[in-house]
């Protein structure tokens, strides 16, 4: 009697990816670490100024109006609004580039690898939202509009925390954290477009498709000239802003329009820089430093400034249901949603955790995902209005919740730092000195 063939081995949960993907993630996180440090400095400066004797100067600067109305376009915005609507569009352009790259050439193109981060991101969004709703169910007066505030993850803040505590997070968890944050950003921009858009100007929205289509046509044909692409991008942003849809959506759509694959080079001609690496990667290399080093820190400076009012004011804010819902959503909801979803998915697929990891590692990583800063503050502004009393409670909740999540994550991850250092050494050994660590060669993951 013939023996029953054994089923093929299942890919373990949080298994190590390819060398090319690991190298790309490492480079992205290195840049985000620098941006995260600048972000923290900008947020700290805003908090100090907003709680100093010169606080009026900060709020006067934030509320200073610039712009005007030209050709029926309403572009008379405060500096805070310019940062939220304009500069964050650059951040979401990078998000769009990342998303397309992940779905076309990254881990998300493989359904078996994409299932876990997508499911974890959804779980990490649903549970914090439910906690916020439960806490604010009887608050009334539109409090539930902020349900999406504790659902976001700030990858720059998270990797800055990793840099500060000096831990070598294994490559599998680093890749998962970045992929989770990318999917998280997609869900966030979808929520903003669907739930925080009220009056839509159909004509302006239709007109926005024209410069967007021209931009897509240009980049598909390999056009790189800034004097062509920047005006088309600005026109798309202006018309999207006028349409009533949040202008940051324009950034994501522009990112989606950029091709990922390398373009064929005519015979006899050397490839352009973008053709050697792919247009999306070429754009990302140039736009990410602007996003991480300028756009996000400036937004954080104008968004994080809140007059706490001393210990009494802080205590009063923490007793408010909105603040409490945000803190609980970030600190408890995010890790519970991510870990629970991961456990359920691993049980359904009968996949075991990678041999080098433990579930406490997943808990620590999911606590990092509870650091919701940039997008959480943006959603708070949209939900309650910039400068409103509830917006002040949002800022305190996001800041305190993110710092608390970062602190817990640091404690959890530091307890495993010795194991992480061992894994890091294993992942960097290159005995044949060919530039590819041996663990990736044994897995035939050179590409």
Swiss-Prot record:
It catalyses: Na(+)(in) + 2 H(+)(out) = Na(+)(out) + 2 H(+)(in). One of its GO terms (cellular component) is plasma membrane. Keywords: Antiport, Cell membrane, Ion transport, Membrane, Sodium, Sodium transport, Transmembrane, Transmembrane helix, Transport. The chain crosses the membrane at residues 34-54, 77-97, 115-135, 146-166, 176-196, 200-220, 290-310, 321-341, 359-379, 393-413. HAMAP family: NhaA. PANTHER family: NA(+)_H(+) ANTIPORTER NHAA (PTHR30341:SF0), SODIUM ION/PROTON ANTIPORTER NHAA-RELATED (PTHR30341). This is Na(+)/H(+) antiporter NhaA 2. It comes from Mycolicibacterium gilvum (strain PYR-GCK).
